[in-house]
Amino acid sequence: MDFFRKMSFADSTGDAIPFYHEGKYHIFSLTSPPGTTVYPARLRTTWSHSVSEDLVHWEELPTALYPGEGDEPDASGVWTGSVIYGEGKYHAFYTGYCLTAEYQQTICHATSEDGITWTKDAANPVITPMIELYEKLDWRDPYVFYNEEDKC
């Protein structure tokens, strides 16, 4: 059995995004779309999604997030972020990557009722870098958490 092999651009995956809710372990990860031949492979990256109850047996679920189109803030790829559950919904905060935008990397938001079908926030990007404090590039990878006590 071949456990390790060099991956092609089309097989690229990375940045595991773990999440645990109601007895299930979820792993979201950045995955290059099938047939990717561009370099770097992270262009047009999607969020894959797998779930397990025991961390041994995994079920691959439908792709959670896809890049946008045209001048949308995530048109060049959906990059790393984090997932929380709060106020009856799943929330994904992720890096929107768009090569043609003034701010190439921004923070975007998507929600889901069931953790499988996601809807991007019409207000995306929800956060852009303050250029006087942060770079336009390398401003990414949001980590959020839900505070049960304060409900926020």
Regions found by a protein language model. Name each.
Residues 1-152:
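Beta-rich carbohydrate-recognition and catalytic domains
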